[in-house]
């Protein structure tokens, strides 16, 4: 294996691990872990819900997640293309949120399916998100 191929493989592995850490950070309410996948100046666009910094998105979504009984973020197909110290990825994500019981003892399950379209860069010895666009392909309430 060439050095370039090995470097690309290591980059893809680091990026995939970061995607997993992001989901785990949100699901386990570990804010530092969720922050860790973003560069300080990273930006985020979550369809019509949020536009701003990556850390700002984590802060914004924290309030929503804290008000839910449970939440689950699961990633699936992930295509990562590395170009030197930058990369792009498209990752399918399923997000399931369960509301707390309402006064009638009912609970809602919110399911969203979409894609993370990420721009990554390698800075200060780590791969992190420079920009993310979340595309919501469908959402259902049960």
Indicate residue ranges for each PLM-predicted region.
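A solvent-exposed, acidic/Ser-Thr-rich amphipathic alpha-helical stretch
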Residues: 31-96
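Beta-strand elements of well-folded, non-transmembrane domains
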Residues: 95-99, 120
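Short, low-complexity N-terminal intrinsically disordered segments enriched in polar/charged residues
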Residues: 1-28, 32, 36-40
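Short, surface-exposed coil-to-beta transition loops
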Residues: 73-75, 111-116
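Short beta-strand edge/turn micro-motifs at domain boundaries
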Residues: 88-90, 113-142
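Charge-dense, low-complexity intrinsically disordered segments
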Residues: 5, 9, 48, 107
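Short, surface-exposed loop/helix-turn segments at secondary-structure junctions
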Residues: 101-110
